[in-house]
């Protein structure tokens, strides 16, 4: 199977396609304004994992955060204590009966053993092993979720006594991954293994480190999302399309109320015809890229 070299939202340095048609602004992480007269919602595409001191905060973003009465996230990452998160991961991400090495081609098993301690992940489900493996380069470069945009914004919003809301729970997210067809999970893991072994083949929507430079410049991949849709349609549908449609429905309801709200979700959710800006524009709202 032929895979695209890069997919925005995952570890990658140079993105091949840009999301166009929304206008341009000075280089900064991408943000849109959705409005209908007395209501406005800002959409900000985050990176969940960043290195310390990544210079992503801009005066415009800070003004929007100050103005917003409600601040949205994919999930409330600050609400899960380590023990609860560990239990969720064990419930949805482990498979004591089917070793990973029995599910992968021999070449992938050999490559995986060179990349990590196979014994530690042998009884993880493929999606969980892929997620852990894809995060290792970011961690090695000093990036953490604690310094990521989502948790940084959450702390700021709470300190300013904003209403903090989430589209999903952490369990919703774990259940979504666990519900992927086994073949899609294995394809995802194989892609991550290949990427670590030979360089980028398919950049999947969980972000290690080097996308940071492109994200800071406001760049979003379009062709890469198309590649994901073609090569792993079940993952594309579960991770992006269905969630984006559900979130757009929620936000359309919010547009019935006057005021300003701020949405912070992974940057990949902003890309392409199934991205939040396009979905809300299709509902008749004015959508403009402001950063």
Predicted regions and their residues:
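A cross-kingdom marker for long, charged
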Residues: 234-291
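Bacterial N-terminal signal peptides that target proteins for export
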Residues: 1-11
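Hydrophobic alpha-helical segments
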Residues: 16-19, 60, 280
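Sec/Tat signal peptide C-region and signal peptidase I cleavage site
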Residues: 22-27
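Bacterial N-terminal signal peptides
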Residues: 9-21
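Structured, acidic catalytic/metal-binding patches in enzyme active sites
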Residues: 28-235, 239
